[in-house]
Swiss-Prot record:
Purpose: The PKS fogA releases the carboxylic acid (8E,10E,12E)-3,5,7-trihydroxytetradeca-8,10,12-trienoic acid as its product, as well as derivatives with one and two double bonds.
Protein name in the entry: Cytochrome P450 monooxygenase fogE
Cysteines engaged in disulfide bonds, as pairs: none
The family this protein is said to belong to: Belongs to the cytochrome P450 family.
């Protein structure tokens, strides 16, 4: 005879088993997707590497929007420009948050990294601050930094052309440290540079690990003690290293502001805003540190992609050089030439389409239930923008893996302008919606100046195999597989276009040297930079 208590336990067990059986299943009103397995859903089908290839295949199979069931979570993948614009841009209030990221945000970042922060009050405050310190007016004031570092990069290419990837990393990092903290990074071997990128690389290894993913898909795993989860232990250690580095940079800028040696930079602006908004030193340090990591890696990666593209498609460089020679002659291009160099401008846009860096974008999250194309998108769903699929849609971009700037010759808009209009977007390399990169103004200027000056000064040719004497064709499919995707190291033969241009590069750097001290830092505030008369921050 079954007692009442036994009956209750039996019902509870049946209910628990029923709920467990639902994990991994795709509800009928969700967007379509690949077949699932109980508990796992589609977890077993997510590749460890080159995920963009599989995600593009699913896009061709399932259409503009599909869903992946990942344990207890659901991911909605957007595969067309229309889908991204409709949901992430037009319905931005719903899709401005981020999914849970226990290791990346809660553990490594102590909840302070803006990139992964939920769209709560802190994120909204920081977004407003970022607009004030990274807007188009402010972007124009940093042109002296961009001018200096592109000239230094030309000298580096002239002296050690085989190390061109290192030169672009140093350029990108130095530009970012100047704009963020007010100091130049004069060598890629700077210990501050090395520590920052060591932390970034080690963090990504943890964030991309299967264990980290499982703790997001099955949150109960987070309660496992640290001694049984090495990922958690290492993440906490990385947080201590990271916050120490970021605070050191921030407090050093504060000290320089107090003694009158600081240069205009984001952190000086932050100190003024910190007095107005009363946010913590740790948050301020993470804002600066996050800008450092993001800006340093992305610009360099895009430039590496451009060099690979013109090595594979040399006719592009020839056309661009003819345009530059006609407009600029024997002088270096500058930002005043933007309206007169439409093909070079198109090269910048095509680079961002051809090698966007974040091939699957950065994930957003829905904050309430929504409906699109008749499918339900549930609250807290992860929203993934399949940038690779959009950028390689043959209906919009015929022969998409051909690097062809002519696609953009009739695009008169800057990326920022196109992102805010009803016209076709140039690309989604800077993201979309309310999470779009707010450094877009600075990035597009850095890329134009770098690309135009490199093309003015140098020819980029395929390297020759010393044994076979045949040209080496870089593989456009040989990509790094980290947080930010770029071509893996490849050889190229980089030579000055003429002795006169090589001499001019040296002369331009000689003029810059007069502005630098013995440590190769700015002697005074560069001419043209707006210095706000901030009182020293205690």
């Amino acid at each position: 005879m079954i007692t009442a208590s036994s009956a209750i336990l039996l019902v509870a067990l049946i209910a628990a088993l029923w709920r467990l059986s639902l994990i991994g299943q795709r509800p009928k009103d969700y967007p379509p997707g690949p077949p699932t397995l109980p508990i796992l859903g589609n977890l077993h089908q997510i590749p460890k590497a080159r995920r963009h290839i599989q995600f593009e295949k699913w896009a061709r199979q399932y259409g503009p929007v599909y869903s992946l069931i990942l344990g207890t979570k659901v991911m909605i993948v957007l595969n067309t420009e229309d889908a991204i614009r409709e949901l992430v841009d037009k319905r931005g209030a719903i899709y401005a948050s981020r999914p849970e990221s226990f290791i990346a945000q809660d553990t490594i970042s102590g909840g302070l990294r803006i990139l992964w922060m939920h769209n709560g009050e802190t994120w909204k405050m920081v977004r407003k601050l970022a607009h004030r310190i990274l807007n188009i007016t402010t972007a124009r004031t940093y042109v002296p930094y961009q001018d200096l570092e592109t000239k230094r990069m030309l000298v580096d290419f002239l002296e050690k052309p085989d190390s061109f990837i290192e030169h672009m990393r140093r350029f990108s990092t130095s530009l970012t440290t100047q704009m963020t903290f007010g100091f130049r990074t004069t060598t890629i071997h700077d210990p501050r540079f090395k520590e920052s990128f060591d932390i970034f690389d080690e963090s990504w290894e943890l964030v991309a690990s299967p264990v980290a993913a499982l703790m997001d898909f099955f949150p109960f795993l987070r309660k496992i003690p640290d001694f049984l989860l090495p990922v958690k232990r290492e993440a906490k250690k990385l947080h201590q290293r990271e916050i120490t580095l970021f605070r050191d940079h921030y407090f050093e800028t504060r000290r320089k502001l107090q003694d009158g040696t600081a240069k205009p930079c984001v952190c000086v602006d932050l100190m003024k805003l910190q007095k107005e908004e009363s946010f913590s030193d740790n948050l301020a340090a993470y804002i600066g540190g996050s800008l450092l990591q993001a800006g340093s890696e992305t610009t360099a990666g895009v430039l590496v992609g451009f060099i690979q593209a013109i090595t594979i498609f040399p006719s592009v460089a020839k056309i661009a050089q003819e345009e530059i020679d006609y407009i600029c002659g024997d002088r270096l291009p500058d930002l005043n030439d933007v309206p007169d160099l439409p093909y070079v401008r198109a090269c910048t846009k095509e680079t961002l389409r051809w090698m966007p860096g974040f091939l699957l974008g950065l994930p957003h999250a829905a904050t309430r239930d929504d409906v699109y194309l008749g499918y339900r998108i549930p609250n807290k769903a992860t929203i993934l923008m399949n940038v690779w699929a959009v950028h390689n849609n043959p209906e919009q971009y015929p022969n998409p893996r051909t690097f062809d700037p002519r696609r953009y010759m009739d695009h008169e808009y800057y990326p920022q302008t196109a992102a805010n209009t009803e016209v076709t977007r140039d690309h989604f390399a800077f993201g979309a919606g309310r999470r779009r990169c707010q450094g877009i103004h600075i990035a597009e200027r850095s890329l134009f100046l770098s690309i135009s000056r490199l093309l003015w000064a140098f020819d980029f040719k395929r390297a020759v195999d010393p044994v076979t004497k045949l040209e080496i064709f870089p593989s456009m499919d040989d990509l790094s597989d980290g947080a930010f995707t770029q071509p893996n190291t490849f050889p190229a033969r980089i030579v000055p276009r003429s002795e006169e241009k090589a001499r001019r590069v040296g002369e331009e750097w000689g003029k810059v040297l007069e502005l630098l001290d013995g440590d190769m830092q700015w002697r005074t505030v560069p001419e043209g930079l707006i210095w706000r008369d901030y009182e020293a921050v205690a």
